[in-house]
Amino acid sequence: RLIGRERGYHGVGFGGISVGGMVKNRMYFGSMLNGVDHLRHTHNLKLNAFSKGEPEHGAELADDLERLVQLHDASTIAAVIVEPIAGSTGALPPPKGYLKRLRELCTKHDILLIFDEVVTAFGRMGKATGSEFFGVTPDIISCAKGITNATIPMGATIVQDFIYESMMENADAPIELFHGYTYSGHPVACAAALATLDI
């Protein structure tokens, strides 16, 4: 089972729409991925209308994960995916302490935490990643756009060592991660990414 968040955006592919919380993105499609649920969103204009930076109210909304754990059982939840800053729903920063609390709960229940950093990684927030900016370490980071300075399409997935080691130890094929696309690892995209990182 995967847990997304209401108002979350993770692209318009089948999986991204399923875990994303954008109702209008799902309304033109039939059934989505099974086993997906959503945390409540953190946008509260009434309480946070004049907040500067991270909103003061709403960190407790991370505890909505406890409701989903009670509903589904933690052993059935593989991961929670959120954007450090909700991009397509208004560039909304999380409430103070929200991401740290989400990290604590994922650790407590042995659930992976994924940050979708397509928008926030590679200097967009003055740090290498949004996770570094907020001082929260997820288990997986998905990133794109800024990795090549948006000059050529490329994306990447960054994982904690324990995930990488698990993939290497349990590979049942000559390819460690049997997943990819026709243009994955394109040399020009990789060169653009390396040049961007050098800058």
Language model segments and positions:
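Conserved N-terminal phosphate-binding loop of PLP-dependent enzymes in the Aspartate aminotransferase
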Residues: R1-I199
